[in-house]
C-alpha cells in the first residue's frame, strides 16, 4: 500500500515530480555502482571476511586446546591406593609419596559434566597420582538421584566406590579404575533416562576393575548405599559452605577454595 501511494503522488506531481524522484534514485544508484566505491567495498569486505575467518579459526583452535584430553595415552593409574574415612571421604594417593598438591573433588556419578572432567583430566590425574605429585580426596554426592531411572543411582554408585575403597583399596589402581569406568560413555546412564545400572552391573564393573569378591558382594547387595547417601548429604552441606551456597558438580577444591577448571589447572598445581 505504501508503494501504491508513492506511485499516485508521483503522477500528481507531473514531470517535475517524477524528475525529482528519479534524480534521487539515480544518485543513490550511482553511489552503489561507482567503480571506485565498489573496489573500496570489495577491499573492506575482503578484509572483513579474512578477519572473520581468522577469528573462527582462532576460536576452534582455542576450544580444542581448552577441551583437549590432558596426558592422553597415559591410561589407568597403576600405583595409587585408596582408603575410606569414617565420614565416607575416599583418599587416593601413592604410598610413600610426598604430594605437591592435595585436592578435594566433588562429583555425582550421574553428572555429565563430571564425565567430561574425567574425559579431559582423568588420565592426567592418574599420571600425577602415580608420579607421587598428587593426593585426591573424593566426595561422591547424590543430588542427581532424582534424575536417575531407579531414583537412587547416584547413591548406589557412590556406595560401590565406597565398597571398593574399603575392601580393595589397597590394590593399586583398582579404585581409580572403577571411578573411570563409572564415567565412561558406555557405562554412565543418561539424566532422566529410561534405565541405569543395577547393583549387579555395578559389581560387574568393579570385577573388571580388579575388585575383590568381597567388594563385589558389598556392591551387589547394596551394603554401602545408605552410608554413601548419608555421607553425600554432609558433603553437599560442606560444599555449599565452601562455595557460598553455589554447590554443584564437578567442583575441585584446593587450599579451601574452588579451582577454575581451565586446561592447565592441574599442571599449575603440581608445578
What positions do the PLM features span?
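C-terminal cap of thioredoxin/glutaredoxin-like
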Residues: 2-69, 203-271
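N-terminal hydrophobic targeting segments that direct proteins to the cell envelope
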Residues: 61-87
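Extracellular/periplasmic catalytic domains that process cell-envelope and extracellular macromolecules
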Residues: 98, 130-131, 170, 244-246
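N-terminal carbohydrate-binding/catalytic regions of secreted carbohydrate-active enzymes
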Residues: 43-46, 61-63, 112-115, 119-123
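Structural alpha/beta surface segment adjacent to cysteine/selenocysteine redox centers
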Residues: 115-196
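Mid-domain, small-residue-enriched loop/turn segments at the edges of structured enzyme/sensor domains
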Residues: 198-200
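Short active-site neighborhood of thiol/selenol oxidoreductases, capturing the structured segment around
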Residues: 97-118, 136, 140
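A short beta-strand-turn-helix
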Residues: 84-101, 242
Amino acid at each position: 500500500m505504501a508503494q501504491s501511494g508513492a506511485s499516485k503522488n508521483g503522477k500528481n506531481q507531473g514531470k517535475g515530480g517524477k524528475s525529482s524522484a528519479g534524480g534521487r534514485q539515480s544518485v543513490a544508484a550511482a553511489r552503489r555502482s561507482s567503480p571506485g566505491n565498489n573496489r573500496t567495498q570489495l577491499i573492506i569486505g575482503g578484509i572483513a571476511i579474512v578477519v572473520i575467518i581468522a577469528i573462527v579459526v582462532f576460536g576452534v583452535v582455542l576450544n580444542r586446546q581448552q577441551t583437549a584430553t590432558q596426558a592422553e595415552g597415559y591410561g589407568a593409574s597403576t600405583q595409587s591406593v585408596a582408603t575410606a574415612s569414617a565420614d565416607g571421604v575416599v583418599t587416593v594417593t601413592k604410598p610413600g609419596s610426598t604430594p605437591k598438591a592435595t585436592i578435594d573433588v566433588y562429583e555425582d556419578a550421574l553428572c555429565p559434566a563430571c564425565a567430561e572432567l574425567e574425559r579431559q583430566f582423568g588420565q592426567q590425574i592418574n599420571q600425577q597420582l602415580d608420579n607421587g605429585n598428587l593426593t585426591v580426596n573424593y566426595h561422591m554426592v547424590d543430588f542427581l538421584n532424582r534424575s536417575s531411572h531407579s531414583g537412587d543411582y547416584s547413591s548406589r554408585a557412590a556406595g560401590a566406590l565406597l565398597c571398593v575403597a574399603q575392601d580393595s583399596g589397597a590394590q593399586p589402581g583398582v579404585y581409580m579404575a572403577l571411578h573411570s569406568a563409572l564415567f565412561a560413555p558406555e557405562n554412565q546412564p543418561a539424566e532422566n533416562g529410561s534405565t541405569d545400572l543395577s547393583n549387579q552391573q555395578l559389581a560387574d564393573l568393579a570385577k573388571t576393575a580388579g575388585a575383590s569378591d568381597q567388594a563385589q558382594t558389598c556392591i551387589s547387595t547394596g551394603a554401602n548405599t545408605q552410608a554413601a547417601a548419608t555421607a553425600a548429604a554432609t558433603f553437599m552441606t560442606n560444599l555449599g559452605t565452601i562455595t557460598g551456597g553455589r554447590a554443584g558438580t564437578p567442583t575441585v577444591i584446593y587450599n579451601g577454595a574452588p579451582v577454575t577448571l581451565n586446561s592447565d589447572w592441574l599442571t599449575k598445581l603440581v608445578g
